[in-house]
Each structure stands twice: as C-alpha cells, then as structure tokens.
C-alpha cells in the first residue's frame, strides 16, 4: 500500500507542476500581448480597399505607432511629422532590397548620420496607399521601426483630437 501511495503522490506532484507551468505560460503569453497592445494599439489595421479615413490611437508613450506595409512587407511604423521623408532602418532596407541612391546626411534625435536616399514603391497604412514615396535609408535606427515622415503623411489630411489621429484622402479641389 505504501508503494501505491507513493505513486499517487508522484502523480499529484506531476499534475501540480504541470498546472503551474501552464499557468506561468498563459500568464507570460497574456502579459506579452498586453505589453504589445500598449506599445502598438494599431497593430491590426484593416486594409480596406476604399482608402477611407483611418483613425489611429496614441500608444502608452504618447506616440502614434501602427503596423503598415513597405513594398508589401509588414513593418512597424512610428508616425513622425517632424521627419521629411520615410526613414527606413538599414537592415530592413537590405531585406527589402531597396535601391540606394545618392548619399545624404540626416539630422536625427541622436545627431547627424550619413545614409542614402531611396524611393519606396508602395507604402500602405490601413487602406491608405501611396506609391513612389521618397525615403531614406538610415543606419542606426533602433528596433527596426520605420519613421513615417511627411513624404507619406503629406499626401493626406491629418486631424488630431485627444488621443486619436485621423488620416484621410484630401478632398478634391483642395491644395
């Protein structure tokens, strides 16, 4: 009977360990999703075909971050009205095989850096699409995030209210 009791104890211990492992795994998965949603509340934008208005939510750090596409590749974008062009990290530009044109110097939050001018065939944010967008390949951009500058944003009307930013196609007949 003592052997039988030991087997039950081992089974109970195994089930308890499996329960805790499952609980820790689920907790980690939930926390990771929660953290990602705080950083990029616009990760799952619908790609509508009509080019209708797109409303983005500000993230926990006060920035507008969204998942979009560069030449068909899904990327994380930080909307930056202070950037003249769409700035692409050098490693992402390499992966997308972006053409590197003239060398240029760029002012960033971390000082001046040397990079190259490029042209992006297509930039997509939700249902908003722009083609032949001037861009720059910038070494040293952290985290693989694309800075979505005015060479894209300037093609749309922007309206900010509270913690939301709405982008829409300009009305016909306006500037």
Predicted regions mapped to residue ranges:
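Pepsin/retropepsin-fold aspartyl endopeptidases
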Residues: 1-76, 81-175
């Amino acid at each position: 009977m003592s052997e039988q009791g030991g087997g039950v104890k081992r089974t109970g211990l195994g089930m308890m360990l499996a329960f805790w492992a499952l609980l820790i795994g689920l907790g980690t998965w939930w926390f990771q999703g929660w953290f990602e949603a705080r950083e990029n509340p616009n990760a799952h934008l619908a790609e509508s075909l009509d080019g209708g208005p797109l409303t983005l939510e500000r993230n926990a750090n006060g920035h507008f971050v969204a998942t979009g596409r560069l030449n068909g590749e899904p990327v994380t974008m930080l909307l930056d009205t202070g950037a003249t062009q769409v700035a692409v990290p050098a490693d992402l530009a390499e992966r997308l095989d972006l053409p590197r044109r003239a060398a240029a110097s760029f002012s960033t939050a971390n000082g001046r850096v040397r990079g190259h001018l490029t042209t992006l065939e297509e930039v997509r944010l939700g249902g908003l699409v722009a083609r032949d967008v001037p861009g720059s390949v910038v070494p040293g951009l952290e985290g693989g995030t694309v800075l979505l500058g005015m060479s894209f944003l300037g093609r749309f009307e922007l309206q900010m209210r509270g913690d939301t930013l709405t982008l829409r196609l300009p009305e016909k007949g306006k500037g």
